[in-house]
A protein has these predicted regions:
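Class I SAM-dependent methyltransferase SAM/SAH-binding core
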Residues: 100-102, 111-158
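A short glycine-rich, Lys/Arg-flanked "PGG" loop and its adjoining helix->strand segment in the class I
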Residues: 182-197
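Substrate-binding/catalytic lobe of Class I Rossmann-like enzymes that use SAM or dcSAM, i.e.
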Residues: 211-329, 338-340
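A short acidic, Gly/Pro-enriched loop at the edge of an enzyme's catalytic core
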Residues: 157-168
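Conserved alpha-helix/loop element of class I SAM-dependent methyltransferases that forms part
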Residues: 65-66, 76-99
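Conserved SAM/SAH-binding loop
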Residues: 108
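A short SAM/SAH-binding and catalytic strip from SAM-dependent methyltransferases
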Residues: 167-180
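N-terminal auxiliary segments of SAM/dcSAM-dependent transferases
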Residues: 2-58
Length: 341
């Protein structure tokens, strides 16, 4: 069932209320960003959980159940581009019937279910957010795919599965939530059988990002706060971390740098090339949503603080669109690596 504007955050799994939860997230984000090393992981987990409790309804309302971007070719629909991006991941990993793969950071299961349907493999989704997993299980049952979908409620660094459990693992714009790439890749390495592969689309600040440019720094800061990201690393950090934990790196490249005619990944956020399907996620659509939520809050149709959540997400969306246009940020740094054996 589609999320309706008037139902946003009505089922927030927190007794403090939306407004208090937003403030707790913002304070927690600053604390986690500035915390000492020994407190860092605990603070990160709290921030991630708060963030996804708040934004999941908005993601589904404005984007759908597959929480990621994709480049498009001219004439390709937004929905088709997302599915193609997911199918490519399954193809690269050679997923098929009889295989078991881990989806690290499965969200509400949109991509997981598409990959399970496409490949016939059984997919185990890993997610620390109970609110999202409740939906993922329901969507799997509704789609008739519960036999190919399993879900684990645990954090990325401590996955509740034995060593060498999986034939493959992937992550679609999800390991960006974990700034310590060595730790997250070490855990994925542990989970894979010898010879198995891992693939991901990672958030990265590209080589065009200038840490001395105040415009670049402001865009990165807005992207982090609005996206619940304590850090966004450079591609070299990704590559080095993969090798440090023992992976053989098979391929890395920025899929945003497509050759030939293409529609940029950030187009749905920027709003050029208007279509009804992408209106909610566009800049104009987000403004309409803001104005509607302002009225709905005043009428007490949606909880107090709902507009503030939307504005936090808009901060991220605007920053992503501009950072994408400038070429200083990509959400699709593709990595493909193998565990030796």
């Amino acid at each position: 069932m589609a999320v309706k504007l008037t139902n946003l955050l009505k089922n927030l799994p927190r007794t403090a209320g939306v407004d208090a939860t937003v403030r707790e997230y913002e304070e927690g984000f600053r604390t986690a960003r500035d915390s000492a090393l020994e407190d860092e992981q605990r603070a990160e987990r709290k921030v991630n959980d708060l963030y996804y409790d708040l934004v999941t309804d908005f993601y589904e309302y404005g984007w759908g159940r597959s929480f990621h971007f994709a480049p498009r070719v001219p004439g390709e629909s937004f929905k088709a581009s997302l599915a193609r991006h997911e199918h490519y991941m399954a193809h690269v990993l050679g997923l098929g019937p009889g295989m078991v793969a881990a989806d690290i950071g499965c969200g509400v299961g949109g991509s997981l279910l598409e990959i399970a349907r496409f490949s016939g493999a059984r997919i185990v989704g890993v997610n620390s957010n109970a609110y999202q997993l409740e939906r993922a299980r329901r969507y799997a049952a509704d789609a008739g795919l519960a036999h190919l979908a399993e879900f684990l409620n645990c954090d990325f660094l401590h996955v509740d599965a034995p060593d060498e459990s999986f034939d493959a693992a992937y992550s679609i714009e999800a390991t960006c939530c974990e700034p310590d790439k060595v730790s997250i890749y070490s855990e994925i390495f542990r989970l894979l059988k010898p010879g198995a592969c891992f693939a991901a689309y990672e958030f990265c600040m590209t080589d065009r990002f200038d840490p001395q440019d105040p415009v670049h720094l402001k865009l990165k800061a807005d992207l982090q706060l609005g996206g619940g990201l304590l850090e966004v690393v450079a591609p070299q950090t990704i590559d080095d971390a993969l090798r440090a934990v023992g992976f053989e790196v098979l391929a890395t490249r920025d899929l945003a740098l497509q050759t030939g005619p293409s529609v940029p990944w950030y187009q749905p956020l920027a709003g050029s090339g208007f279509s009804l399907a992408s209106f909610r996620s566009s800049r104009v659509g987000r403004k309409v949503t803001d104005n509607s939520l302002r009225a709905l809050e005043a009428l007490r149709v949606v909880p107090r603080g709902t507009l503030r959540v939307a504005q936090t997400l808009n901060l991220c969306a605007d920053a992503m669109a501009e950072a994408g246009r400038l070429g200083i940020f990509t959400p699709m740094y593709f990595i493909h690596a193998r565990k030796p054996g």
